[in-house]
Amino acid sequence: MKKIKVLWFTNTSSNYSVGNNEYNGGGWISSLEKELSRKLNIELGVSFFGQGQPNIINKNGVSYYPLTVDRSIKSKLKRFGSIRQQEKSQIDAILKVINQFNPDIIHVFGTEKIFGLITSFIRIPVVIHLQGLIIPYLNAYFPPSYSFVDLLLQDKSFLKSINSYIGFKKSAKREKEILQNCNFFMGRTDWDHRISKLYSPDSKYFYCGEMLRDEFYLSEPWENKTLGVVIQITSTISSPMYKGADLILKTAQILKTKTKLNFEWNVYGINEMNLAEKKTGILSKNVSVQIKGVISSSELCKALKKSHCYFHSSYIDNSPNSICEAQMIGMPVISTNVGGISSLIEHNKTGILLPSNDPFLAASYITQIVNNQDFAIELGKNARKSALKRHNKELIITDIIKAYTSINESNE
């Protein structure tokens, strides 16, 4: 059977640089690449924007095409103020790689970057793998009581925060163009499926689960009976306001003042909560919230196994791998019911769903899980069973190859 040549465009270098300890994002793409590259009927190329001089290599049967754009002062001055000029420079670099690899199918991971715009420049079929979606994320960018003014409160980083928000709005505008011009999508939640149909009604959607990092497949299941006396709650978030640092602080304060729980709330992925502390008037140190920064996947896996529950605080999300990883090791998960999360959690069966910005209900559910071991164990067992099926590597590879075959046949 003739090989299908597939060219990936990714936001990370995937397995191009082995040994990097990525924590937030990208790890599942590396896992998918490793498994897919073993299939004899697929020839895989991977392209991404990187720093320095590009070094095209072939490793473990995968061709890597790092992309660079002219970053000279002269070039920057020429492009200054012209987003379209910047995009043209990047599109030219992307088209050069496409001509070099000559793929049957192009697989773009995410709509956050420029890669999805290439549908207007080529006749090769392009499938976009939906990840986070900027347009609905922009709608939830400021949590209740937050506004653009709060960007000015972010100490020395306020200029960076303002630039980030402006860039986010520009990316949302570009994402609209990308979604409207794409005929094929891959996704994994009812939410991303519906949004793809809103913007491209005649498009074809393929369900495709995501692989997790290896540590979570290999981990021994979570056991409630081995946990310590001090209640451990774990969350992983990033810096945007919509990730819900304020909800963590408010929930922790309610646990402190309204319950007798002796707890520590460990928050990974960030180094400070300054803005959330200012907005809520709650200092993390006063409510037993400990900010742990970025850690490796193996360290996170160990931390989760020592925790009584995982809490996801975001105001918008599609299918956060942090939830999936916690479910995979079989621990109880509490999450806001936003975006695509209801496709991951069945309330009171594989986890707990609650309205965003409801710290009272959050505190109540945490208390229930801690005080009712049978309930916690049942949630964890059900979650693990669901996650093992959802993240089955062979099933994911089968689904993705079926999608590639269908797309390739539709183009013949």
Where are these regions (language model features)?
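N-terminal subdomain of nucleotide-sugar transferases
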Residues: 1-58, 62, 253
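Glycosyltransferase donor-sugar binding loop
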Residues: 236, 249, 263-278, 293
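Short hydrophobic beta-strand element within catalytic cores of glycosyltransferases
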Residues: 332-335
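Nucleotide-activated donor-binding/catalytic signature segment of Leloir-type glycosyltransferases, i.e.
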Residues: 277-301
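Conserved acidic donor-binding segment of nucleotide-sugar-dependent glycosyltransferases
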Residues: 347-348, 352-359, 368-373
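Aromatic "clamp/platform" in nucleotide-sugar-dependent glycosyltransferases that forms part
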Residues: 315
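Conserved donor-binding/catalytic core segment of Leloir-type glycosyltransferases
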Residues: 7, 224-243, 249-252
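Membrane-proximal helix-turn-helix segments that form the acceptor-binding/catalytic region
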Residues: 32, 134, 150-185, 198
